[in-house]
Each structure stands twice: as C-alpha cells, then as structure tokens.
C-alpha cells in the first residue's frame, strides 16, 4: 500500500494507517467490529505514518472516544451543540468586572457537558478547530450584542488557534462577523499563544495587525509557559500580556515567583502592554498582583466560568459586593 504509483504523469505515494479488529475475539456484531477497527486505526494514525494497530480495549479506550468525537464534530456543529461559558475578568485596582473570557463546552447528547481538554486536541489534529473557532467567535459576538441590547456593556476575549491564524482570510472573516452582529470591535479581544505565530509568522502577523488596526484587542496567552519570551514580543502586534497560571499558582509575598511575576509586569508595562493574571485563586495572590501593578485578574477567587444566563446576575452582584 505504501508503494509509489503514477497518476496522470505525477508520482504519488501514500502512508496508510490500518486498524484491525478480530472476530469473535473482539466482537461478533459487524457494526461493533467496524467501530473497534476505526478506533484502532485512529490509534495507528497517532503513532505516525505507515502504522497498524490491533484493537485493545485497555489501550484504545481513550482513543476510541476521541475518534467518536472526531466523527461527530460536523453533526455537533450543525446541531449547535457547542456552547460558551464566560469567566469574569476583574480590574485589580477597582475590583470591577472589565470583561469575560469565552470558554467553549460541548453539550454532548451521550456524554453530557464535555470540557475542552477532552476535545480541543482532537479538533486541532483533525483541522476541525478552524470551523469550531469561527463558531465560538460567532457565538461570542452574538452574546455581546444580546448583552448590549439588555444594557450590559462589557467585553469578551476569545481564544484563537494557530490553524485559524494561518488562514489568509482570517482577519476578513472576523471583521465580517463583527459587522454582521453589530458589535463594537473594541469589545472583542483575541487570545493567541506565541507558538501560534512561529510556523507561518508572516501570515499570522498580517492577520493580527489588520485586526488590531480595526480596534480589536490582541492578547498573548500563557506567557511564562514554555517557549514564550520577551525577545519575541517586539514583533508581535499585541495589546495585552496574559501571565500563565503556573506562575500565579505559587504566588505569595514570600515566594520567589513573586519577583518573576513582578518583573514580568514591569517589562510588559515598558512595552505599553496591559497585564492579565489567570488562575487567581486566593486573596494573597490578588494582593501580590495589585502590589506588582497587574491590571486584570481572572480565576476561581472571583468566579468559575458561568453560563451566559448567569452573567447578568453575577455582574450586578459583583458590582455591589466585590470579592476582595
């Protein structure tokens, strides 16, 4: 199957992935055998090109579920099974709500409410992250428009994947959604990771520059996790820096991470960037961030991500009695 062959004068080669299920050892029903073989094939694909795998219940349980997710992505999109929850972002100085981050969930008919750690990786590997990302953007913009009509003026941050940024017309698609929903561009912020712009930096930066120039906020997410460094920030058209929760987790007045976070905030300010801290869970962490000059905090200390219908009540009650 891997042999090279000619097609219309062009030499082609394939790298097959094969999944094998055996009857009656694995199952006797045809549909079950096919499903198990599909799951084994998915495991073979993840192992690399030109591989084969036998069905193994103990090793392939997770892979089979991921394969099932991949097969149902299109149906889920058509049936509007993806929903957004919104985690508040709080101004550190005033303790007022200054916006929300939109986080996608899958209201799965079989598995219930599925969190993104179970399907985003599959979506990225399969390429489905591109239509899913646009669906998330549309949902967030529609919700912003609905809130504004109800008298709630706020902003929403939406995560964007590398594959989306690599689409030459990505910025045009985003601006089209903004125009269709009638929201103010300044109310929308896109969160990216540094690795998202490394492979095709020219295309990604062109998209980001067009969106920033249109009035959108651009936030660099997960800063302090992995590759990200200040040397690369000068070339990125960003307006905000988001410190990763791994640096916030151990934050206290006595901990060395306090100096790291404070230095990060200081350097970001010199680049005229606003700073967001994610994963804030304690009052001590909030105090350290306030002393360090952080602009915005987000985390369970304030609230878990909320369904859209609960945001109004949270917004009103937090404005009246903020968490300190």
Residue ranges: model-predicted function:
Residues 52, 62, 91-101, 126-204, ...:
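Catalytic core of bacterial c-di-GMP phosphodiesterases, primarily the EAL and HD-GYP domains
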């Amino acid at each position: 199957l891997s042999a090279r062959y000619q097609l219309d004068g062009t030499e082609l080669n394939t790298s097959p992935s094969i999944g094998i299920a055996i009857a009656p050892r694995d199952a006797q029903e045809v549909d079950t055998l096919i499903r198990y073989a599909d799951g084994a094939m998915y495991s073979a694909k993840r192992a690399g090109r030109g591989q084969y795998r036998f069905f193994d219940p103990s090793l392939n349980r997770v892979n089979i579920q991921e394969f099932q997710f991949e097969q149902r992505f299109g149906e889920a999109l058509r049936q509007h099974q993806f929903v957004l929850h919104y985690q508040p972002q709080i101004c550190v100085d005033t303790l007022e709500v200054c916006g929300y981050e939109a986080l996608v969930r899958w209201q799965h008919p079989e598995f219930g409410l599925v969190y993104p750690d179970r399907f985003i990786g599959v979506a990225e590997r399969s390429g489905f992250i591109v239509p899913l990302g646009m669906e998330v953007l549309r949902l967030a913009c529609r919700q912003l428009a609905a809130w504004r009509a109800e008298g709630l003026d706020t902003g929403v941050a939406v995560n964007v994947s590398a594959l989306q940024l690599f689409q030459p017309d990505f910025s045009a698609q985003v601006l089209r959604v903004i125009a269709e929903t009638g929201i103010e561009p300044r109310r929308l912020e896109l969160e990216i990771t540094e690795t998202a712009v490394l492979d095709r930096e020219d295309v990604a930066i062109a998209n980001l520059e067009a969106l920033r120039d249109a009035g959108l906020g651009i936030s660099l997410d997960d800063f302090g996790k992995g590759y990200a460094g200040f040397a690369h920030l000068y070339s990125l058209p960003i307006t905000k820096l988001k410190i990763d929760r791994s640096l916030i987790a151990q934050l206290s007045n006595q901990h060395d991470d306090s100096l790291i976070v404070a230095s990060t905030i200081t350097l970001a300010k010199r680049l005229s960037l606003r700073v967001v801290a994610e994963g804030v869970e304690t009052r001590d962490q909030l105090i350290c961030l306030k002393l360090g000059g952080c602009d915005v905090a987000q985390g369970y200390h304030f609230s878990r991500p909320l369904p859209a219908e609960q945001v109004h009540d949270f917004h009103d009650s937090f404005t009246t009695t903020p968490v300190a």
